[in-house]
Structures are given as C-alpha cells and as structure tokens.
C-alpha cells in the first residue's frame, strides 16, 4: 500500500481563470475538446456513464460521445443493455470525461432521453458494416459461454447481410443526456485545482467557482 500512496505528480499544465470562463458551458466544453483532439489523446470522446439500478447501486461504463450541442450529449447503445434498463427506471445519469494527461476533466449530471428513430438510423447507417453486424450479434450484458459463441454468431450474421444494407435492430438506439450541471476541473499546482460548475436554472446557466 505504501508504494501506491507514493504515486503522485504535480499538475502544472495550466490554470482556469474566471475571465477565461464563458457564460455558456458548451462553449468551454467545445474549446477543451479541441485541445484534447489537438493533443492526440487516444479516444478523446471516451466518457464514463454512471447509472443506478432499482436498489440505488451505481454502475459505470465507458462509451463514446457521438454528438454534443446546446441540448446535451449523445451516445448510442444496445437498448437491452444493463445501462438502458437502468435508464428506463431512473433517467438520472452522470458523465465524466477523464482527460488526465492534460490535467482536465469534465463532469456532467443530467437526464437521459431516448433519441428519435430518425437520428438513430442516421447514425447507424454511418457506421462501418462490421460494426452494424456486431450490433446484431451481441445481446449486451447477458452471460455467454465463450468468446467463440460471439465469433460464430458474427460469421453467421456477416454471411446473412453480405449483400445490401444491414437493417437497424429494434433493440439498438441512443440517448441524449440533457445536462443539469456541468463541472470543469483544471489540475493546479500544489493541489490548488480550478473548478467551475454551471448549474441549469430555468433556461439559464448559473456559474460558480468551487473550492478544490
């Protein structure tokens, strides 16, 4: 345990000043995402999505951000997955973008809303064909006997859909997370981190600085 407790580093890659924080959190998110992409971080759109089950037990998993805008953050998934079942019972979720290599992270709380079939179909048809086929193969979050079962099913589906378009599975869709709060964290020297949180009040965003 002592070896783990000795692991530390200083955060020296920047500061976040009040005058540099815009009124709209999506403007800041867009600016930070550009920094992330320019820094060539692997999987810059990877985000942890947390849901809770009917007993209040939290679960997390990594998904990829596929769109964001004034309305919120979008991801796609199997609608029979554990996270989709959780969202059906409790649509309150949280998202974390862990950009640790550049001393930044963004934490979001919000409500997950199902996307329209039109938007889901548009994105599904933009995916590589192999990814479309994989959506048919995996009954996400259910137990399987071995990886071989997945590979066999994939081969079967690949043959089945060898010609023409792969249809959209009824059990595949996506969510828009409408944010209620968005917190930006910038690592600071001597652990004096900069934290700003935006909270949605009506149609407006209220911005506050938080102690580290």
Curated annotation (Swiss-Prot):
Domain of life: Bacteria
Top-rank EC class of the record's enzyme: oxidoreductase
Residue sites binding FMN per the record: 61-66, 76-77, 82-83, 105, 140-141, 185, 195
Gene3D superfamilies, sorted: Electron Transport, Fmn-binding Protein, Chain A
GO biological process, any: pyridoxine biosynthetic process
Keywords for this protein: Flavoprotein, FMN, Oxidoreductase, Pyridoxine biosynthesis
Cofactor(s), by name: FMN
Record's cofactor remark: Binds 1 FMN per subunit.
Record-linked Pfam families: PNP_phzG_C, PNPOx_N
GO molecular function, one term: FMN binding
Residues at which substrate binds: 8-11, 66, 123, 127, 131, 191-193
Keyword Flavoprotein (UniProt): yes
Signal peptide positions on this chain: none
Pathway of action: Cofactor metabolism; pyridoxal 5'-phosphate salvage; pyridoxal 5'-phosphate from pyridoxamine 5'-phosphate: step 1/1; Cofactor metabolism; pyridoxal 5'-phosphate salvage; pyridoxal 5'-phosphate from pyridoxine 5'-phosphate: step 1/1
Annotated catalysed reactions: pyridoxamine 5'-phosphate + O2 + H2O = pyridoxal 5'-phosphate + H2O2 + NH4(+); pyridoxine 5'-phosphate + O2 = pyridoxal 5'-phosphate + H2O2
UniProt-listed Enzyme Commission number(s): 1.4.3.5
The family this protein is said to belong to: Belongs to the pyridoxamine 5'-phosphate oxidase family.
Alphabetical list of HAMAP family matching this protein: PdxH (MF_01629)
Subunit relationships: Homodimer.
Role: Catalyzes the oxidation of either pyridoxine 5'-phosphate (PNP) or pyridoxamine 5'-phosphate (PMP) into pyridoxal 5'-phosphate (PLP).
Protein's UniProt name: Pyridoxine/pyridoxamine 5'-phosphate oxidase
Provenance organism: Shewanella halifaxensis (strain HAW-EB4)
